[in-house]
Amino acid sequence: MSGGESRSPDMSRAGDGCLGDGGDDEESDGDGGEVNPASADAESTQKKRKKRNKKKSKKKSKADSPGEQSSPPRIPLDKLFPSGNFPEGEVLEYQATARTTAAERRSNARQHWEDDTFLRNYRKAAEIHRQTRRWVHETAKPGVSLYDIAVGIEDSVRALLDNAGLETGEALKSGMGFPTGLCLNNQVAHYTPNPGQKPVLLQEQDVLTVDFGVHINGWIVDSAFTTAFDPTYDNLLAAVKDATNTGVKTAGIDVRISDVSAAIQEVMESYEVEIRGKTYRVKPIRNLSGHNIHQYRIHGGKSIPFVKNRDQTKMEEGEVFAIETFGSTGRGYIVDDVGVYGYGLNHNAPLNVPVALPSAKRLHKTIRENFGTIVFCRRYLERLNVEKYLAGMNCLVQQGVVEEYGPLMDVKGSYSAQFEHTFLLRGTHKEVFSRGDDY
């Protein structure tokens, strides 16, 4: 196939017109008179000159574009393409135009861990957590109400942050990472004393789990511990604490989640506890998990179960994780309890929500301005003097704008425990922010 352009029929006719028979120009003098030989020679010479000029012009136009290849092809290509501009090949667009892998993009998005401000804020939040829970160890005794413990924890956190969080937007700068969880016995997670509930007082035989978070600029230290007043439950607490520490120790860059889960389960199930003459194997809760943490989002998307699984997802440099384990003498499987623990704004919800109820619109605005996607509870709304919010809240929950969280429990008569630490996977080591002398 030739690289040049074929001549069109119009071009052929135009070129052949130079070779015509003279037409009317020759016959204009023709009435039988004699033709002058000198004049005829001159005219013939002029026609030949015109013919030669046309050919030269044609050669010049061909020189500017690729010429015709012979058959078989013998003309060197440099003569056919004197300009060196050869035909471009077929262009097929890439389906993916990204020049980096998904893992590289995730890593680039986590460069905050190298930032001094990020580390300083996380360490500050962890120190506030340690000092606050020291007060809990001293104060949480039989006869004390759960409501007083919860309010005392939250007042302490806000005081140490020097931020009461009462002005619009102040609680987004720093404050509670989520509502304080205070769970007794078979209550495994997500119970908090809310206004209007019957007071609950600690008893000598209770096993109390304390779970609270501290955030600065949306980065949350999530840490929990369990305490008991009767040494009967010491082995239950030891099993869960050991399992959590094993999970933290096993975790690392490029470690698969399935490996962390298997290590946790193996350690926890190696413990037994004797309660009132009956021996129980400590069981990991099968349908709860640890998690990574994103800014303003306590659950970042990766989950770390406490039982063996096939999850080949890897932990990555720069990620923040909350390794928590729950152990139980019951079924090792949680179900919903009655009541409401707290609420959280759905991070996928649109900014402008089409709700007809005016109270729902006002409440949505209050939530966005004061909590964002931080989980909150009724106590936090009432601190802001928000009134008559239940109808509006129900509307937002039904619309999927706000998510509602309830208490979680194992079978009645069982006992459960939880320990949890927040840590950062740095390039050369793990930094366990929430580690303290107590656990």
From Swiss-Prot:
Binding site for a divalent metal cation 1: D211, D222, E420
The keyword rRNA-binding belongs to this UniProt entry's keyword annotation: no
Keyword tags: Aminopeptidase, Cytoplasm, Hydrolase, Metal-binding, Protease
InterPro entries: Creatinase/aminopeptidase-like (IPR036005), Met_Aminopeptidase_Type2 (IPR050247), Pept_M24 (IPR000994), Pept_M24_MAP (IPR001714), Pept_M24A_MAP2 (IPR002468), WH-like_DNA-bd_sf (IPR036388), WH_DNA-bd_sf (IPR036390)
Protein name: Methionine aminopeptidase 2-1
Documented EC number(s): 3.4.11.18
Assigned GO CC terms: cytoplasm
Class of the enzyme per the UniProt entry, highest EC level: hydrolase
GO biological process terms on file: proteolysis
Organism, scientific name: Chaetomium globosum (strain ATCC 6205 / CBS 148.51 / DSM 1962 / NBRC 6347 / NRRL 1970) (Soil fungus)
Segments of this protein annotated with the region Disordered: 1-87
Catalysed reactions, semicolon-separated: Release of N-terminal amino acids, preferentially methionine, from peptides and arylamides
Biased composition (Basic residues): 47-61
Family assignment from sequence similarity: Belongs to the peptidase M24A family. Methionine aminopeptidase eukaryotic type 2 subfamily.
